[in-house]
């Protein structure tokens, strides 16, 4: 069975950019977006046409799709050197923080390492402003972004306690993408 690496970070931190670049240097690894796999399954079942519609499905159906996506990703990992799963550690909602990797997902995925990609809250705020023309982003203040990153750390350690995974924190600062990518690649190669 190949390795399962979960890569995560708050919106705007650059987790997808780091993982997309890292996988280019990791032979036999594939980069998978968890939400894309969920959408694929929901479409196959004729439940949705677009990603935003998943949120409107009954909670039980969403959980089922989450579980099926985790199972599919774990199966993909069996056929590769490893899978890098790009997903949310926690999701900030009006009602509070939602775990991005509930127990039924962790049981299927069994990650080897959870990589938290972080940056300074001010850097993330500026990235979100730049991205706002292409993507719909939340405009959190620096202290809210800092809180979200802390919540991600706490959730990641809880996930690690449940699965035996390690937790690695990688900083992705402005104009230093190569350093973050190098550290990510080194982390994966150390497994």
Swiss-Prot record:
Binding annotation for ATP: 9-17
Compartments where located:
Cytoplasm
One GO molecular function term?
adenylate kinase activity
Q: Which GO terms describe its cellular component?
A: cytoplasm
Ordered alphabetically, the record's keywords are: ATP-binding, Cytoplasm, Kinase, Nucleotide-binding, Transferase
| Keyword Phosphoprotein tagged | no
Give the Enzyme Commission number: 2.7.4.3
Supply the name of the protein. Answer: Adenylate kinase
Tell me the organism: Methanopyrus kandleri (strain AV19 / DSM 6324 / JCM 9639 / NBRC 100938)
